[in-house]
């Protein structure tokens, strides 16, 4: 991943053991992504681990603390491609403290039921996040969260 921007994303769920809902965040900017849904998270700062970046970003963006679970890994490669300059790694995360609020970069948050995967797929996701949503739904349906 040398030379690429590294982004950490969180699939915030209501329970790591038996997830029923996923927290989706609607972008307010930049214009090309405004109104589209994504996994909350952000870029790593110099010397920061993916896990530390996730904890920092979720506190800054949503005002929450979480417990991280397993990573939602792609079928090929170490990270999900976002574009030609950036890649993202995503972890399941369980809300520990705080009430999620759209503090930065988002104008709406929504808990999406996971029991019917089609409902999560009806949101207009940022295109690069859609394959991650599909992989997450497959993992939840098969019970492969650990």
PLM regions and their residue ranges:
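Conserved Nudix-box catalytic region and its N-terminal flanking loop in Nudix hydrolases
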Residues: 19-60
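Conserved N-terminal beta-strand and adjoining loop/helix that marks the start
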Residues: 1-22, 43, 74
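Active-site-adjacent beta-strand/loop module that shapes the phosphate/pyrophosphate-binding cleft
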Residues: 5, 66, 74-100, 110, ...
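Residue-level signal for short segments within beta-strands and strand-turn junctions
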Residues: 12-14, 26, 95
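Short secondary-structure junctions
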Residues: 61-67
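Nudix hydrolase/Nudix homology domain
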Residues: 31-34, 90, 101-146
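A structural signal for short, well-ordered beta-strand segments
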Residues: 10, 54, 90-92
């Amino acid at each position: 991943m040398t030379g690429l921007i590294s982004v950490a994303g969180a699939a915030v769920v209501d329970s790591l053991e038996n997830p029923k809902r996923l927290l989706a965040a609607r972008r307010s900017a930049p214009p090309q992504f405004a109104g589209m849904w994504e996994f909350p998270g952000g870029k790593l700062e110099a010397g920061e681990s993916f896990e530390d970046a996730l904890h920092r970003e979720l506190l800054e963006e949503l005002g929450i603390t979480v417990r991280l679970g397993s990573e939602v890994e792609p079928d090929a490669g170490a990270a999900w491609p976002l574009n030609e300059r950036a890649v993202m790694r995503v972890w399941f995360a369980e809300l520990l403290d705080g009430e999620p609020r759209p503090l930065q970069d988002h104008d709406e948050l929504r808990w999406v039921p996971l029991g019917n995967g089609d409902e999560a797929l009806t949101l207009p996701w940022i295109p690069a996040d859609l394959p991650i949503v599909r992989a997450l739904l497959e993992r939840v349906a098969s019970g492969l969260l650990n």
